[in-house]
Amino acid sequence: MKISINSHSSIRIDNIYFDPFQIKRATHNAKYIFITHTHYDHMSLQDIDKVITLDTIIIAPQDAKQALEEKYQNKIIYVAPNDNISLSGIEVEVLPSYNIGKEFHKKSSAWVGYKIIYNESSFAVLGDTDNIPELAALNCDYLFVPIGGTYTMNSNEAATLTNKIKPKFVIPTHYGSIVGTKKDETDFVKKINKGISIKILL
């Protein structure tokens, strides 16, 4: 199993892609493309073009409908927080993803994160979110958590959430490109409790 982050929050697990962005080399091998929300750095059509095939299934929030259907003939599944769906080879739980006290990602937008069960492991990709109450009970093997601040939780808030969830592995995201720095990464790593393995992929 190969896990990588191309840039920012552009995550790949084998041929499963989340928010493809700044893709340097076209692969055209995506089985699934998951979109967390419609901001340009998370739903980039020019980057989707580089990984999509005729058989790719796209999973996205409802407000992505017009842009996706104007361009793609693929099967598209629209989801909302707390949905559960079954796909070939994976189970999907749709997570809420929003800001508290900030206007960038409103709860009313119904934007999402995803927890998938794949290859006998569970992976949680949180999207652009703060440390919201709904995530406190999350259970996963691999946690992809944003740490860059401004549009998401900051490194301290992300570490607090990670230590509460207690995943086997944590992978910090959403820094080093548009917002967030290597210092945020360093601060995050220092605050993670022993027993949680940290994977740095950016």
Residue ranges and their predicted role:
Residues 1-4, 72-85, 136, 159, ...:
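Binuclear metal-ion centers of metallo-dependent hydrolases, dominated by the metallo-beta-lactamase
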Residues 115-168, 172-181:
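Metallo-beta-lactamase
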Residues 29-37, 71-81, 89-92, 141, ...:
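Active-site regions of enzymes building and remodeling cell-envelope glycoconjugates
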Residues 22-23, 38-40, 63-65, 80-85, ...:
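Short, acidic/turn-prone active-site loops that include or flank metal/cofactor-
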Residues 22-67, 139-144:
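Active-site metal-binding motif and surrounding structural segment of the metallo-beta-lactamase
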Residues 48-66, 71-100, 112, 186:
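Portal/gating segments that form or line small-molecule/metal binding sites
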Residues 1-28, 78-138, 153, 202:
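Core dinuclear metal-dependent hydrolase active-site scaffold
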Residues 34-35, 93-97, 145, 172:
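Redox-cofactor binding/interface segments in oxidoreductases and associated redox assembly factors
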